[in-house]
A protein has these predicted regions:
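Bacterial signal peptide processing site
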Residues: 11-14
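Beta-sheet-rich non-transmembrane sensory/scaffold domains
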Residues: 17-23
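C-terminal motif of bacterial Sec signal peptides marking the signal peptidase cleavage site
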Residues: 6-9
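Gly/Pro-rich cap/lid or specificity-loop segments adjacent to the active site
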Residues: 23-231
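Sec-dependent N-terminal signal peptides
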Residues: 1-3, 17
């Protein structure tokens, strides 16, 4: 109920101070930016291509997987609510797929619920995959080392895992992080044809949301950051 009241009633002030490092929001023609297809139970699914490296105008692209649960009332629709479950390291598209079981009727009437698998995760392309045997690295590891030898063994194992990740995903890994994910969020907004969107993120999703709001304050209608990270 609190989330519904916050997002339905709140809007951001138009005189928000813009930090010097703030990225400039843009609008785009939404046509064909996301190729939505029906994926059952009133859901739409699609992909959006975004630059891997936002500093390179000739960058290759990565494809973000998105899901959308349409607002149940066209007359009461406010706009888009972008949602992220935190982590990081796993997809978030399930937050729209399970919208009917997660959000209040008020939110479902008022917003298109849009979720996505952040770059490198879930059904986004490419997805980071480091090994065929994750149990080898994590199931038998000692997460509470008591001796220097145990600590050294743990460090060696994690280094082996990290080296494998870079060997298999080196073209993408340097560009998987909070700032680029926040820029991806603005690309999603642009592709949806929205001037402003609302956001709900919890756990690490609060840090992602705060970064997005700092970079693109003029595009924030409202934001709910649940379980916020310690600044």
């Amino acid at each position: 109920m609190i989330l519904s009241l916050l997002l339905v009633s709140c809007s951001t002030s138009s005189d928000t101070e813009v930090p010097a490092s703030t990225a400039q929001p843009e609008t785009t023609d939404p046509a064909d930016a996301i190729s939505w297809e029906s994926c059952g139970d009133g859901l739409e699914c699609g992909y959006l291509d975004v630059p891997i490296d936002y500093t390179d105008e000739n960058s290759a692209t990565t494809s973000l997987y998105l899901t959308k649960h349409m607002a149940t009332s066209s007359s009461q629709r406010i706009g888009t609510l972008l949602v992220n479950p935190g982590g990081p390291g796993f997809g978030g598209s399930f937050l729209a797929e399970s919208a009917a079981n997660i959000y209040s009727p008020t939110l479902l009437k008022s917003f298109d619920i849009v979720a996505w698998d952040p770059r490198g995760t879930g059904q986004s392309i490419p997805a980071i995959d480091c090994t065929d045997d994750y149990d080898y690295f994590f199931a038998g590891g000692d997460i509470t080392p008591d001796t220097d030898q145990e600590r050294a063994e743990g460090i060696a194992t994690y280094k082996e895992f990290t080296d494998l990740c870079f060997e298999k995903n080196g073209d993408l890994l340097p560009y998987v992080g909070t700032n680029n994910s926040a820029r991806d969020m603005d690309m999603i907004r642009r592709a949806l044809g929205e001037d402003k969107i609302s956001y709900f993120g919890f756990s690490y999703g609060s840090e992602l949301g705060a970064t997005w709001a700092t970079l693109f304050p003029d595009t924030v209608r409202a934001a709910d950051l649940d379980g916020a990270s310690d600044p």
